[in-house]
Amino acid sequence: MWIQRDPLGVALVIAPWNYPIQLSLAPIVGAIAAGNCAVLKPSELAPASSAALARCIGEFLDPDAIAVVEGAVEETQALLAQRWDKIFYTGNGRVGCAPPPVVSPTIVARFCDCML
């Protein structure tokens, strides 16, 4: 078996409020394992989990490889306006299935796991 790691660059992970730790860390682990850097935006609806993730990731992981941005809709929109090589979104179908112009026009890949 041949495995070739081909990092994409910087991934944005927008995580949901239900299972906030697991659904935040699973895509982050995959992104980092593949050689990418990642930015995590945990749900504002789980503030204790969001704060714990920000504290632990900031304390124990390389800040050059992974960052956490806490906030609500305004912060999420600001993140989506940036250039990303991959966006991994888990959450509401209304938001996740938004037309591509809502996100950065330079996006290479977008993965949405939505509940419709």
What residue spans do the PLM features occupy?
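Rossmann-like NAD(P) dinucleotide-binding subdomain of oxidoreductase/dehydrogenase enzymes
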Residues: 1-116
